[in-house]
Amino acid sequence: MEAVAAARRDLPPGGPVKTDYVFQGEGADGAPTDVRLSELFEPGKDSLAIYSFMFPRDPGDLTPGPPGGETAGLPLAEGPCPTCTALLDQLDGAAEHVSQKLNLAVMAKAPLARVLTFGRERGWRRLRLLSSAGNSYNADYLAETPEGAQRPMLTVFHRDGDAIRHFWSSELFYAPTDPGQEPRHVGTLEPLWNLFDLTPEGRPLNWVEQFSY
């Protein structure tokens, strides 16, 4: 595992971002505000990880939506992805620790009001939630298909002086999977699936994360 991490750290610099993307976020006063990609880098922290949250979900995902709250009133196809939600439930708990050394943000194509409302309904308190509804970020970084369907990508950027460059993305999502397995592009991040991997039973078959049990 360390050998893979070392090889990743030794990757050559990626391409510079083509624009200083403008996202929508929540200001200190609680009002919507524009946030540039460059503003997601805090002093002394030159790496930024952005998780592209599938909100709206994949059109073929028929998993039941949230059982209550304002988000439950959305058409299923416009609602959030339950698998992404499970990952973000876990990242919210780790975000305070992560943010000591790394900038972290969660991006969704849904309007900001929907993203923030759902975050409150899930009890997320530490994740920085943003909307990319007004720009091409998702399409530019493999988090959106040409048809507009959202994809769950984790993308890392690095700041070098005044330049911001792409460093790494979870492109393993697009690689062929082992028989009967889901993509493991961000699998090392999730306690949920890694705990299953430690058991004699392994990962449960024919089971997916739900909004409520």
Name what the model sees in each region.
Residues 1-48, 53-96, 100-101, 117-121, ...:
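Non-globular targeting/processing and membrane-anchoring segments
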Residues 99, 103-131:
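Conserved segment of the thioredoxin-like fold in thiol-based oxidoreductases
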